[in-house]
């Protein structure tokens, strides 16, 4: 950025002085009807926005510049935010012409985590800022949504856990102390995938005192956040960042809550991704996700609340039961559902309307929308308070107490106010006697002008005479050239035009002064009245926030009830046991997208219990699931995890019956891909995720593992999969679904009492394989990989060669070097037992003597065999084999 020198114009010096205060932001500098950018900002913005780069002359130099129209700036700001930029908005804060240089100030700084504009925000997504305070291995974090006023704080151990919580919230931006270790903060920001700002360390200090002052309370104990010094430091820094960027006191942030993992079902990033809760694995789309299926909400806050419940399912039986009671009542009463939906429709986004108004960024249309929403609350309260479920009745009760504010706003704000305050006319007649008087002067002026025009036409005989107005000359009389000889001597010439001349009279000048003074008075008075209304809203911010919370809860419950009723879901039994019993369970998303409809979906049972639980003797704790490719193993396992998640978020589930013993964490390792950015192979990603499961799972967890060990050699893979399964069975003892193509793992059922074998059934019809999609007791003997390859369209010659190689491997034919005979034309011979690929046996015996030994071993009664007899038998077998 160039130095601020006298060689620059006053306007450019003003720009450079402003830019110097915001070096890390792109400065939108208001010039008339455009926001202009200069120097490096122009180069950056023109490339990011794909707009024309021009130049402004400064002596012999050219200053790079580009601009966007004032009225279209929102869209350009949104695009810059998507690319991770900050934007400082510098507006004209006085009318042009009042002085030589218009006064300009930065009115707000828009960052990825500090967005209030409803045209930039996704109405159904929260917009979280994450502030982080680090001390040793512990971290405090605060989540702040500036657009709704929500503030939460908590503490976690370790950066890995911190990153997981920040990613679960989906933070858009991070804030760190300038005193924090730079390499560490960069690593955290990179892992979270969000831009980061470093702020003065003082903003993290004296946190409790500053928060008490902001919230107007003598103690924070009532908010449940005591004992969280690092969490409070992060919260104070988040509030300071909000106040600094928005240039206003954040009065809408009137409470703080504890961000705790004690009463929620934990889902790590891999699990949220694998289960496709909010984004699909393919393409990262919303369509095709569980959230898209569940979201039947009427309001935007309801949609955000539903997404929050999906990210933070409960681990508290009482709260789960309360939600289920409400869903059960509404799902069984279609009339009640429609009545509630109808009462919700007029309620606009109270949270975001309130935030914009309190922070000084709202307009008259926001006031009108708020008035309409508040007027609709009593009817909504009546509907909710008539229900039986406690959650619904409580929500209705929290909607009361805003009737006076609603009436005040409704009486003050015009039904259809203009888009900007500058246009005026947004205050209703009758709200202010002073304003009504001023408006009357302006409106009466139109009649006065018409009268003057008629009077002067009659007096002068100029039939084409017009009284006109422009911003340069004000009011004037316009006379065409052919009529100039009729102009009276008392008229004063103002301007000559191509077609005639313009004049004023003493009478017209007096009227102009009166009208223009009235317009100025009107604009100033309307601005004061708007500010008074805004302050009235801010004074009721806590009640409005409470009502907004109730609306969101009621809408989310209605959405879950609608889905339950329309899709035939049932109420799950959620208890304190360690069992998981799903009868005729279905995958909620898969059944919804089947071409032949949900009826074509094949339901499955999943019965499992933690080792040592009463139900474990029957169900087992670790289910080894085998079966062909494409048979549906992964779908069955995912649907079990989704049923648990739905039940613990308080939703009905797709099953005939479901009993869920409370789960503390769901872990899934289903599929993997290279993490090129971090230099990790597919196998490394798989092993990292598996290690996290083994370190963090408890006996109350649900673990879903698919194809552990497939990213390495067969022997390594089988060994790792076997050891992982043993650990989950012996050490963790949790409910585990373990899908594999390593059929050797079926032998675990003979060695471990709580292991059960299941397989997905198939039927062979001629040379075709029919996938039955049904989970049955027992194990699989084949994976039918070549049949799946045929379905995928591999060339016939490739399939034929694959079958040839498979036969060689199954027959254990080897070449002269003892290797499996895969290549054509190589001389083959039957392989010895030592060359068999199976880790745990199988295949034909090498010779008749070995057959006889095997028969003898199978016939032995081991319980009756003495040690000396065993040694004698071994010696005899050894001689026969030699």
Swiss-Prot record:
Coiled coil: none annotated. InterPro entries: DNA_mismatch_repair_MutS, DNA_mismatch_repair_MutS-lik_N, DNA_mismatch_repair_MutS/MSH, DNA_mismatch_repair_MutS_C, DNA_mismatch_repair_MutS_clamp, DNA_mismatch_repair_MutS_core, DNA_mismatch_repair_MutS_N, DNA_mismatch_repair_MutS_sf. GO terms for biological process: mismatch repair. It holds the Pfam family MutS_V. Keywords: ATP-binding, DNA damage, DNA repair, DNA-binding, Nucleotide-binding. One of its GO terms (cellular component) is cytosol. CDD domains: ABC_MutS1. The keyword Cytoplasm does not apply. The keyword Nucleotide-binding applies. ATP binds at residues 627-634. Gene3D superfamilies: 1.10.1420.10, DNA repair protein MutS, domain I (3.40.1170.10), MutS, connector domain (3.30.420.110), P-loop containing nucleotide triphosphate hydrolases (3.40.50.300). PROSITE patterns: DNA_MISMATCH_REPAIR_2 (PS00486). GO terms for molecular function: ATP binding; ATP-dependent DNA damage sensor activity; damaged DNA binding; mismatched DNA binding. Belongs to the DNA mismatch repair MutS family. This protein is involved in the repair of mismatches in DNA. It is possible that it carries out the mismatch recognition step. This protein has a weak ATPase activity. This is DNA mismatch repair protein MutS.
